[in-house]
């Protein structure tokens, strides 16, 4: 079953409300890992999905990881919580100070990042996938363009002519065309998208790093329609960014639909990993996964006793789970870690 449009996905989501506390917690834990992993992975963070889960949910570092990547991921989660709390105060208008504070949180001094929380003082640009250099707003025009962006957002939100999805997509596009900071602009943009959706009681979404090319291509196609002048991009209209809006609508519909499935589907052989629904054809996978989650220190012989599956079959299934990075065995203590959720 697939939703043909975002309206159907949102209707299905609303029909599930109010969620139980258990389902809220399940969604929160899943989103925390998915969002932080993907948003940072897009920008080059090297922590694996499993490392991210253990770090954010249990406060531990497993395997080899750079200090910078660990600190970056931890700060990202602090920023996510800050954004979520701020979005709940719906009567408070958006301010530049909040965006700068969010940036300061993501790129703290212990990362030795230059000018965290302050707008750029030197030009920034990007080399596109097609080899072209694309210039963002100059340092001189950035403060006024950011003032325009925040003023436009608050006015547009009050007027209500744009849907929350249109508002979030257009804010993202305008913000990226300004690129106000010297680093961290993509991560801020993805946080602000969820800030806007949360303010309007929409589920939060994840831009998946495995689909980074689709994300960047949609922005590129919208750039072609708007043109290369930074101030034009910073003041773009919703009709000007049709390629990105189409992408964004599909993204929101897909993410909401997956949330609906995650909450409502009752199938013990269906698991989730980084936004993907994994339906195992045999219940033996579920037997093994549940056994490892219940008792992480199980040996193969223990698994055989609990599941009734032969050791040879268990080893084959484990090899497949490990290859997909759904599970991992600790090098020091030999305990199993399951990175799939239900």
Where are these regions (language model features)?
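FIC/Doc superfamily catalytic core
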Residues: 1-183, 187-342
